């Protein structure tokens, strides 16, 4: 395998924006794993945003322990590219929330209709580590990035 730190952040953003779903993982209060599929959008700063109800396990887990992991891609036959994403989650407020909602609504035009749901919240993940893997190549391209590497 070929490991590198020389991926173009714009290329990584393009890959992430070509996907709408991610498997999101969090840690339950009793230290057990919990995973769910979420629809997400991504900012130019590699922040992932998704909505959920505050009563969901993922919301409760992330309020208790903000460490989050997501896997994106790898589900399309013939396309063996994936991103593993680790970060810290929060519930943005104020101007940050408004900015991220606009990004989310651009990806999900039905998002504003859900905004009126009782208990709907928005979760933001800020990256701490990202691994892009392209197994379509031989040898595979594996790129690991830290938050400081992710400037678009």
Residue map of PLM features:
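Short, basic/aromatic recognition patches
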Residues: 2-22
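Charged, gly/pro-rich active-site loop segments
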Residues: 2-7, 79-152
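Short secondary-structure boundary/capping segments
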Residues: 13-14, 40, 60, 112-115, ...
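Alpha-helix boundary recognition
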Residues: 16-17, 63-64, 105
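Short beta-strand segments
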Residues: 19-54, 60-62, 68-73, 81-85
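Generic structural signal for secondary-structure transition and capping sites
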Residues: 20-21, 67, 109, 130
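A generic "binding-loop/recognition-motif" signal
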Residues: 54-55, 128
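AMP-binding (ANL) adenylation modules
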Residues: 76
């Amino acid at each position: 395998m070929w490991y590198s730190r020389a991926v173009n952040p714009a290329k990584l953003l393009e890959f992430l924006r070509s996907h709408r779903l991610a498997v999101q993982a969090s840690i339950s209060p009793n230290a057990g794993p919990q995973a769910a599929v979420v629809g997400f959008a991504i900012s130019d700063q590699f922040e992932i945003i998704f909505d959920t109800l505050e009563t969901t396990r993922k919301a409760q887990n992330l309020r208790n322990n903000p460490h989050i992991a997501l896997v994106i891609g790898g589900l399309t036959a013939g396309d063996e590219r994936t991103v593993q994403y680790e970060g810290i989650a929060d519930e943005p407020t104020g101007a940050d929330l408004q900015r991220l909602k606009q990004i989310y609504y651009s990806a999900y035009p039905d998002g504003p209709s859900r905004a009126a749901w009782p208990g709907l919240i928005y979760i933001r993940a800020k990256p701490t580590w990202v691994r892009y893997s392209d197994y379509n190549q031989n040898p595979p391209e594996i790129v690991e990035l830290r938050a400081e590497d992710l400037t678009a």
